Amino acid sequence: MTRATQTLLLTVTGAVLVRMAMGDTYLRYVNSWMRWPLLACGALLVLLAVVDMWRDEPKADGQPDHAPDGEPESSHVPRAAWLLFVPSLVFFLIAPPALGAHFAERAQTAVVPAEPSTEVVLPELPTTDPVPLLLEDVIIRAAYDGDTLADRRLEITGFVSRDASGDWFVTQFGMNCCAADATVMKVLATGAEAPADDQWVKVVGRYVADTGVGGGTPPEVTVEDVQLIDAPTNQYR
């Protein structure tokens, strides 16, 4: 790999990071708070490439730089370094989507401690009907105090995933940093035909008592209405 190729690699990688962070694409792979670090890293890589090109220009006398032994200066980089272009090419050619149903079937499910270290006090639900809840809120309430969900119509949002038996779930991924550490949150939906996998839905239903207790299994909701919706810009929690 020549010096010019290394400079090109810096430029392309930096441009990819800047392009991702300037739009919403980065939200498929990392948390929203990482936008500015991505922009800074991308800009720094482009700046390094510009500086490298400036330093590599011929001298005023037109003579190239020479190494101490009199041989022209060259860079000896392993051919494997060409693999560094692969992530950039993948982004430009494919742009992988956010994690979806296929990964949800195999991912680690978010675990709620069966016995919390401190007493869990859950606030009363709003009086709206149906009451909109995040999947994580349904999971926590079912695990620790399912009575707070009793006799209430819940509105939950997520994408459709299935398990090996064919049951379907309203699903969403939560992540701390990036897609690599994502955990899946899901609520079992019964009483209605499943939409297509990966389809985002808004489901209205009632919590099935004594499901999801202790956080070992997903809570269950008897579906009253399913509305197909567009995927949100940020598909993670």
Roles of regions detected by a PLM:
Residues 1-237:
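OB-fold and OB-like single-stranded nucleic-acid-recognition modules
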